[in-house]
């Protein structure tokens, strides 16, 4: 506990809360170019090959984005749109790549939750 004199000399500094998605810089989405597309394995109780991409954003940030859904057409130099949202079992993955936007195709044969995966309405 500081004394009154200590508080007069240097007042209390308000702690800034850390941002969960700093690379977006307050934007809802950001555009970027894939620099590497690869698979990685999740944390302990889970087991899979999760598809992720390293993306260089238009503001210069380099982030890792998760590619949701079954199958994808992304490769190096693909232009993608990124949104916030982490993947709990992949450390360091704090962004999602939007499906059906720019170079990313929607998920084929998707019947439910289509808007999340950029899939058109089946005929």
From Swiss-Prot:
Domain of life: Bacteria
SUPFAM superfamilies tied to this protein: Nucleic acid-binding proteins (SSF50249)
GO cellular component terms given for this protein: small ribosomal subunit
PROSITE patterns noted in UniProt: RIBOSOMAL_S12
Described function: With S4 and S5 plays an important role in translational accuracy. Interacts with and stabilizes bases of the 16S rRNA that are involved in tRNA selection in the A site and with the mRNA backbone. Located at the interface of the 30S and 50S subunits, it traverses the body of the 30S subunit contacting proteins on the other side and probably holding the rRNA structure together. The combined cluster of proteins S8, S12 and S17 appears to hold together the shoulder and platform of the 30S subunit.
PANTHER family: 30S RIBOSOMAL PROTEIN S12 FAMILY MEMBER
Name of this chain's protein: Small ribosomal subunit protein uS12
Organism: Rhodopseudomonas palustris (strain BisB18)
Highest classification ranks of the organism: Bacteria, Pseudomonadati, Pseudomonadota, Alphaproteobacteria, Hyphomicrobiales
Gene: rpsL
């Amino acid at each position: 506990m500081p004394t009154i004199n200590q508080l007069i000399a240097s007042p209390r500094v308000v702690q800034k809360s850390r941002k969960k998605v700093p690379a977006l810089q307050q934007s809802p989405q950001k555009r970027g170019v894939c620099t590497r597309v690869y698979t990685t394995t999740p944390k302990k109780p889970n087991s899979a090959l999760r598809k992720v991409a390293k993306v260089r954003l238009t503001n210069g940030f380099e982030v890792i984005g998760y590619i949701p859904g079954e199958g994808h057409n992304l490769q190096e130099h693909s232009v993608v749109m990124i949104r916030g949202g982490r993947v709990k079992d992949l450390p360091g993955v704090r962004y999602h790549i939007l499906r059906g936007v720019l170079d990313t195709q929607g998920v084929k044969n998707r019947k439910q939750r289509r808007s999340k995966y950029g899939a058109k309405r089946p005929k």
